[in-house]
Amino acid sequence: MQQLASFLSGTWQSGRGRSRLIHHAISGEALWEVTSEGLDMAAARQFAIEKGAPALRAMTFIERAAMLKAVAKHLLSEKERFYALSAQTGATRADSWVDIEGGIGTLFTYASLGSRELPDDTLWPEDELIPLSKEGGFAARHLLTSKSGVAVHINAFNFPCWGMLEKLAPTWLGGMPAIIKPATATAQLTQAMVKSIVDSGLVPEGAISLICGSAGDLLDHLDSQDVVTFTGSAATGQMLRVQPNIVAKSIPFTMEADSLNCCVLGEDVTPDQPEFALFIREVVREMTTKAGQKCTAIRRIIVPQALVNAVSDALVARLQKVVVGDPAQEGVKMGALVNAEQRADVQEKVNILLAAGCEIRLGGQADLSAAGAFFPPTLLYCPQPDETPAVHATEAFGPVATLMPAQNQRHALQLACAGGGSLAGTLVTADPQIARQFIADAARTHGRIQILNEESAKESTGHGSPLPQLVHGGPGRAGGGEELGGLRAVKHYMQRTAVQGSPTMLAAISKQWVRGAKVEEDRIHPFRKYFEELQPGDSLLTPRRTMTEADIVNFACLSGDHFYAHMDKIAAAESIFGERVVHGYFVLSAAAGLFVDAGVGPVIANYGLESLRFIEPVKPGDTIQVRLTCKRKTLKKQRSAEEKPTGVVEWAVEVFNQHQTPVALYSILTLVARQHGDFVD
């Protein structure tokens, strides 16, 4: 039997000594031996730090984003290899899609976020300038820099691809290498994907390592520049979190654990409403997808007391139609658990719930002697959920959920929160007031809550689907950690530092001009410069323009804006302005007339306007002038040879009056041509 090799220190290595076996979930056949005994974990970490970390830190965010996109495209081209291996885990094609293509999709999402929202630099200014002095000579910004260590990702068995990729994406975008430690039961699928990434040559040497087997003494060798993430059981995560070296060196530890997630039926819903059918469908889908082996799966079904039997009957009727078996056979809707060990664990947890007072409405007993690790869809009923703590603390990690009655909506809220912290929850209701109250009271114990009704159902991504744009994690039992959430996740792999100094020094450090920093003026209008020629701080001070009552009248007639402060002399005199004032949007238009270079040149288009603030009113007779300054530049990747190479330039605009008082502050974005393209076929 072949051993599943690890990829450490840039080479594929086999362990020695005691090994565990990976079995086929359907046939029970032994497929792989897994061991990492004898492998040098300290050397593996050092290799990642010496090779992978410097290479990734040297890349800009834009370059890292491009790397993510390239890896995603490569993995997508090889997806059928992964689907074939995924069948060994008992998953259906639909189950595997979530894991394989869902994981690859997360790479694409982070590639897009990085290219659109992060600077073309290795430093990430997190906020705008923070003034710290009266005259403006001393200020600060928070900057994010890549940690110099390695991210250790300890992952669960249920999503061997997505579980790795959803962590790799923000890790690499943040500039850190990763050591992946997958769960043994499905490590062959993770290994295949890692091998594909390594063989592609798309990532720097040392950017990714893989441990098939135990992590050994790896955690003992980490220091404060390293990061550890864990996905798995709450018990294991709590044990690792207090590992002496992690505690002693305050090593960041992010934990995402299984939880007793709930689905609540609002008291406004009756069996003849569309929401009732949606509720049944959502629960059944979450019970049977991946054979219930999801950390976000619905475990507790909370319904009004009067609807218990109606809900139970509807769930049983639908669950009885679920065909369980080998996913390779036509018509099979639910596959097996990952192995016989997991099947025995689910049976044990079901027995605990039964001993605590729950009743079987469907299923409940697996054939523990069968070769395939099948477990039937199981619906339990807990008649007294307030007196049965086991139902809020015992998770059968399979196609098992427990129905329980709520006396009223307040009681339903209490039961929803009784899980002690959950990754996800769903409320099915058509009543906005019920939804608001549920969020107000239950959100504090949940990482994500879906409000499902007829209006949202058609496009809903579902109760159990973590999305890369949204946070994934939860308080309490769910681990107290947070993954994904768009760019929030990237910050877990970076150090935030408050940097103080003069505005000019802060601008030089961040490569972004800030208000108060020195500017550079020359005889060439900034709009006549190509993207490569522009530098943050390049500036233009425009001629002046005096505003008149005729301007106000003409703009009002042209725009249709006859607001009294502009057109009614008497009403305006009694307003906070004391007299008629110029339209704010005319001030912007006049400002554009002052700073725009009208001829054909590198500036292609106005991309948008941001952060507009009107500081002081402009009155007839006031004279305005504009300072236009290049604030930051963002390269746009050229997607084809035919596409014009461009970049986005953000300009700081300050409009001030004859007293040098700012009257309007804002930023404009322009699409600017580049002199040279970068497309590579």
UniProtKB/Swiss-Prot annotation:
Induction cue: Activated by cAMP receptor protein (CRP) and integration host factor (IHF). Inhibited by PaaX.
Gene Ontology MF terms: enoyl-CoA hydratase activity; ether hydrolase activity; hydrolase activity, acting on acid carbon-carbon bonds, in ketonic substances; identical protein binding; oxidoreductase activity, acting on CH or CH2 groups, NAD or NADP as acceptor; oxidoreductase activity, acting on the aldehyde or oxo group of donors, NAD or NADP as acceptor
Metabolic or biological pathway, per its Swiss-Prot or TrEMBL entry: Aromatic compound metabolism; phenylacetate degradation
Gene ablation phenotype (knockout): Disruption causes the conversion of phenylacetate (PA) into 2-hydroxyphenylacetate (2-HPA).
SUPFAM superfamilies (alphabetical): ALDH-like, Thioesterase/thiol ester dehydrase-isomerase
Keywords, comma-separated and alphabetical: Hydrolase, Lyase, Multifunctional enzyme, NADP, Oxidoreductase
Chain positions covered by the region annotation Aldehyde dehydrogenase: 1-333
pH dependence: Optimum pH is 8.
One GO-annotated biological process of the protein: phenylacetate catabolic process
Cited Gene3D superfamilies: Aldehyde Dehydrogenase, Chain A, domain 1, Aldehyde Dehydrogenase, Chain A, domain 2, Hotdog Thioesterase
The protein's Enzyme Commission number: 3.3.2.12, 1.2.1.91
Family membership noted in the UniProt record: In the N-terminal section; belongs to the aldehyde dehydrogenase family.
Its biological purpose: Catalyzes the hydrolytic ring cleavage of 2-oxepin-2(3H)-ylideneacetyl-CoA (oxepin-CoA) via the open-chain aldehyde intermediate to yield 3-oxo-5,6-dehydrosuberyl-CoA. The enzyme consists of a C-terminal (R)-specific enoyl-CoA hydratase domain (formerly MaoC) that cleaves the ring and produces the highly reactive 3-oxo-5,6-dehydrosuberyl-CoA semialdehyde and an N-terminal NADP-dependent aldehyde dehydrogenase domain that oxidizes the aldehyde to 3-oxo-5,6-dehydrosuberyl-CoA. Can also use crotonyl-CoA as substrate.
Record's protein name: Bifunctional protein PaaZ
Annotated source species: Escherichia coli (strain K12)
Top-level taxonomy: Bacteria, Pseudomonadati, Pseudomonadota, Gammaproteobacteria, Enterobacterales
